[in-house]
């Protein structure tokens, strides 16, 4: 119980620190990230696909499968899935690979972005050539996250995007997130607290952003 309580405290501390230090669209000096924030991350307009997929969520009673830290994380499941959908759709990927995802609703949102979604460890064999979007759900260890990163790194191209859910899950994951940010092929990262975005854009200065959502 003491360990659980400490983990809970650390998570809340990280959340509050992120809220204090993160910027809005107006605090970014990158045209790419400003547009992403303004037109995608902060696009809160209702969409017909939301109605369909939230009906699916109710049918599956999927909230029990959402990986998170307490009520605050569970209450964000709907908003986070819709954010993932918007980012994926804006990115226009042809091939998406998803790993460590326990949520059927998240899979449905990814599939709705008009991509060919592959699941699980067989995905690398099934997807030939490059991977446009890699979605990694809630990894339990930093070693597993880094294993996925380095396994798929040869498949990433300049237009690829890696989405990592739960980048503040524990100290291991936070350390792995820092290692990913420092990698020479990574040019832009966007820390949305609940999820991290990793870009490999060529010709762009290395920058890291924390955006408030």
Question: Which functions belong to the PLM regions below?
Answer:
Residues 1-135, 139-161, 167-213:
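A short alpha-helical cap/connector motif
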């Amino acid at each position: 119980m003491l360990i659980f309580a400490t983990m809970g405290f650390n998570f809340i501390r990280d959340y509050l620190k992120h809220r204090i230090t993160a910027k809005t669209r107006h605090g970014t000096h990158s045209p790419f990230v400003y547009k992403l924030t303004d037109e995608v991350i902060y696009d809160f307009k209702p969409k017909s696909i939301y109605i369909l997929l939230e009906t699916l969520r109710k049918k599956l009673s999927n909230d029990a499968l959402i990986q998170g830290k307490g009520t605050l994380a569970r209450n964000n499941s709907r908003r986070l899935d819709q954010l993932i959908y918007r980012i994926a759709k804006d990115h226009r990927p042809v091939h998406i690979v998803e790993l460590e995802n326990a949520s059927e609703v998240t899979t449905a949102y990814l599939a709705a972005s008009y991509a060919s979604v592959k699941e699980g460890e067989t995905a690398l064999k099934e997807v030939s050539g490059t991977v446009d979007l890699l979605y990694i759900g809630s990894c339990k260890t930093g070693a597993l996250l880094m294993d996925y990163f380095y396994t798929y790194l040869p498949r990433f191209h300049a237009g690829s995007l890696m989405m990592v859910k739960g980048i503040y899950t524990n100290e291991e994951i936070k350390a792995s997130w820092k290692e990913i940010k420092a990698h020479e092929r990574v040019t832009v990262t966007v820390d949305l607290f609940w999820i991290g975005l990793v870009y490999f854009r060529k010709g762009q200065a290395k920058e890291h952003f924390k955006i408030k959502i």
